[in-house]
Structure formats: structure tokens, C-alpha cells
Amino acid sequence: MDKKIFGVYLAKDGIPNNEAYAKLKLPASPWELWDAMEKVRLNEGEQLYMEIENYVAFGYLAPYLDGLDISLNELNDLAALLSVLDEVQEAAFEGLFSMEVQRKVNANGGIITLQDLRDLAVSARTDCYHVVEAADDAQLGRFYAENDFVPELEGVSNEVFEMLDFAGIGRMMRCSENGVFVNSLYVLRDGELTTAPPVQKTLPEKPGYLFRLTLGLCPDFGGNRTTVLDLPASEEALAAAQAQLGTLNWENTVVLNLSLIHI
């Protein structure tokens, strides 16, 4: 999870400027989520305050995520969906998002929901759209004209072709297709969106361990005793593992096997 999408500030609702707070970059692993929640120290009945402080490359989502009823786990899931997009797919997502916003506006004030955003993020990895290298109507019009998308231009001479109103052609095509420009790309949706699977509001179950070690004695000490130790471990668990192996010195042990949860 190297690519981070959001930076969030977590605290107790009602007293956000409290010493019990956490800052977290999303997407985060289950361990990171639970570690942040333990820093906030919510008591029974208390609610979580969450503020998105950094949108990285997705600042245009701020007006729509601000005030949206969304939990930490749901926001983390959205961040995970966005984090796997490459540069072109990110542009496609922004284009699909702009189209969806306009569709909602035309539908008399419909709001962008969390499910809308998740569907768009998933769809940005499908073939429901086309992306053309064009930063404005003139470049778009020339692309369509040069690639025979305008039948009326068939057979025109080079001299006449260069005199065409490419900006007008591009504008006409863009308006008829409801496409949008994103930076230096033109995004056109030409298929159905994919529905993202449901996501729960609550955090996943707290992982029981980060590392699971199978330990044995060094060959020099003989014996075939083994024990399993989950890390992080309490002092009691560490002492119990040593007792099982029959040694008080970790230098006398070897790791026979290592497994870990996804972090």
C-alpha cells in the first residue's frame, strides 16, 4: 500500500482538538487502522471525528466527500480502489466523475454518493470509456477529422482540410458525446459502469497477530521442542514461549517458519 490517496485526522467527536488523536494515510492496513483507533481511545458510546486533511491528487473530490456520511473503513476502501489506478485510469476516473456530477445536476440536484464514487473507481479499470490525447476542442476536432470519424469530410483536399474549423468540429462531437477534457486528455464514456461490491461501515476484525513465528532450539542445544509465537506479543506470551522451549535465552532459538498478515 505504498500509494496513498487521503490523509485523515482522527479524534473524539465533540472534542477534536484533544490529546487523544491520530493521523493516518489511506489506504491503510487493518493493523494501521486499529493502531490509529487505539490512539484516539474512544470510550463506549463515543463517536469518531474524522477530517480529511490531504486529498493528494484527488482534491476535486473534497466538496463531495466533505460532510458525506462515510466511516473510516468506507473511506479506506475507497482509497484502496483509487490507489490501484494508473495515470490514464486516474484521468478516466476524473472524467467519469465529472460526467456523473453533470448527470446528477441535470437530474435536479441529485447528490454524489459513496457508492457512486466506488462504482466509478472500479469502472476506471474497465473498458467502458475511451481516452484520446486532446487538450481542447481544436485538437479533438483534428483527431476526429484525421481518423475518418466525420464522413462528410471524405475526399476533401489537403488545402481544404487545413482550412476546417477543427475547434467547431471538436465542440460538436464533444457536446454530442457528453465527453470531458481532463488535463491533456479527452474522456468519453461508451459503456455501462461496473457496480462495486458492498463494503461494511465498521472496521474489520482486529488482526490477532502481525507475524507468526514457529520457533525451535538451535541444533547445538539438541532436542526437538518447538513453539508458535504471535507478534506483537505480551511479556507473558514471550515467557511462555521460552518455557515451552526450555531456554531463557532467545539466542538459543531459531525461526523455523514465518507467516504474516497482509500489511
Indicate where each model-derived feature is located.
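N-terminal ordered "arm"
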Residues: 1-47, 207-247
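Charge-rich, solvent-exposed alpha-helical interaction surfaces
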Residues: 36, 64, 74-84, 96, ...
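N-terminal low-complexity, intrinsically disordered segments
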Residues: 48, 252-259
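Metal-dependent nuclease catalytic core centered on acidic motifs
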Residues: 79-138
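Conserved small/polar residues in nucleotide/adenosyl-binding loops
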Residues: 261-263
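Acidic, proline/glycine-rich low-complexity IDRs
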Residues: 12, 141-225
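Intrinsic-disorder-associated interaction segments
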Residues: 26, 68-74, 86, 110, ...
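An N-terminal, globular interaction/scaffold subdomain
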Residues: 34-82
